[in-house]
């Protein structure tokens, strides 16, 4: 359960609840991974000019072309192949040039480099060490080439991660907010809202995370040091 006595938060929720009671819209709608791929919601999000992305696991974004090609050739599922091809084009054409704020746990970066575990389109992949290295280096290159692409790292400790529940991943663009709880079953973990006040509320929450004392911005060179 979550609660807040902060006046700013309660007033914001009061406005949302009042509007919802007047018209029976859902604040958050369940979305299956299959529907997300079919309706291009994830592709639209990565194509957005403004993105706020908080991953609680390895970042499923901006993989270099060579790695994407290997993943495409490594699956026999035609619909997933087509999804990966579209995702590759979106990364090439839009995501690398967009205004992106990306937040990751420091331990998540380290774990990804050690284990190579990556979920892409809700499909688990076991990445090779060279693929992980290429991915991290490409993210660093995007940081260098796009001044509007910024990476923030939450300096977490093993004690913090064990004593507190892992928050869901949050993806915010200009049109929607998507929440992914990777601790739940794959067919239960996506919820989406296109409700403007929900998008604004989560955007404010995201921006608040960036102000936390344990949240620091990383340069491209600092990211490469994880390797």
What are these regions (language model features)?
Residues 1-13:
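Basic, Lys/Arg-rich alpha-helical nucleic-acid-recognition elements, primarily the DNA-binding modules
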Residues 24-218:
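Hydrophobic protein-protein interaction segments
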Residues 216-227:
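Charged phosphate-binding loop/patch that engages nucleotide di/tri-phosphates or the phosphate backbone
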């Amino acid at each position: 359960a979550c609660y807040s006595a902060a006046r700013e938060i309660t007033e914001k929720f009061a406005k949302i609840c009042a509007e919802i009671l007047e018209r029976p819209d859902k604040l958050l709608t369940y979305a299956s991974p299959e529907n997300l791929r079919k309706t291009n919601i994830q592709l639209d999000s990565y194509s957005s000019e403004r993105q706020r992305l908080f991953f609680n696991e390895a970042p499923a974004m901006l993989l270099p072309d060579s790695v994407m090609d290997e993943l495409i050739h490594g699956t026999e599922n035609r619909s997933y192949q087509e999804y990966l091809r579209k995702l590759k084009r979106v990364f090439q054409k839009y995501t690398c040039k967009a205004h992106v704020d990306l937040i990751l746990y420091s331990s998540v970066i380290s774990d990804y480099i050690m284990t190579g575990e990556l979920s892409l389109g809700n499909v688990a992949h076991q990445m090779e060490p060279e693929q992980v290295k290429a991915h991290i280096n490409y993210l660093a290159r995007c940081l260098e080439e796009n001044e509007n692409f910024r990476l923030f790292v939450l300096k977490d400790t093993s004690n913090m991660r064990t004593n507190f529940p892992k928050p869901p991943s949050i993806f915010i663009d200009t049109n929607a907010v998507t929440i992914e709880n990777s601790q739940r079953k794959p067919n239960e973990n996506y919820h989406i809202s296109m409700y403007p006040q929900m998008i604004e509320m989560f955007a404010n929450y995201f921006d608040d995370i960036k102000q936390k004392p344990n949240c620091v911005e990383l340069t491209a060179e600092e990211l490469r040091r994880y390797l």
